[in-house]
């Protein structure tokens, strides 16, 4: 299957979408399946993801960004290899009043929604989250 940016990702008179993925290793399956997919590498961690997101917005002016990648499940209700959409993101290491929830603005497309926490190390869980990643809060 070939991705058709002009007709699928960016139909006439529609929003221009870019897909941010932290690493080339994570992006490889999408690039192999859809060589023309509008993929950009965001980098690993909050600082890299925030900088890449800001740069991509400033340089490419997309209408919509999608952050995709591999996350760890901190809740057994999330199956291995399950695709989910993040409804909200927290930074797990921030204490008390600083532990705010960043709401995601997304189109669920039939995906199960979960809460996520962005963490710099494993084993740090924010209350009520099902998955963890290293970039989400910086992206939102």
Regions inferred by a protein language model and the residue ranges of each:
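Gly/serine-rich nucleotide phosphate-binding loop at the start of the catalytic core
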Residues: 20-23
């Amino acid at each position: 299957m070939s991705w058709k940016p002009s007709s699928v990702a960016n139909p006439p008179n529609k929003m221009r979408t870019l897909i941010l993925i932290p690493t080339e290793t994570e992006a490889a399956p999408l690039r192999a399946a859809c060589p023309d997919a509008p993929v950009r590498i965001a980098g690993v961690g909050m600082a890299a993801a925030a900088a890449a997101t800001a740069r991509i917005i400033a340089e490419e002016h997309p209408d919509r960004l999608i952050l995709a990648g591999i996350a760890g499940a901190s809740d057994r209700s999330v199956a291995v290899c399950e695709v989910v959409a993040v409804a909200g993101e927290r930074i797990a290491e921030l204490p008390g009043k600083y532990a705010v929830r960043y709401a995601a603005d997304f189109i669920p497309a039939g995906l199960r929604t979960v809460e996520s926490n962005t963490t710099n190390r494993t084993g740090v869980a924010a209350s009520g989250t099902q998955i963890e990643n290293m970039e989400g809060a910086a992206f939102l």
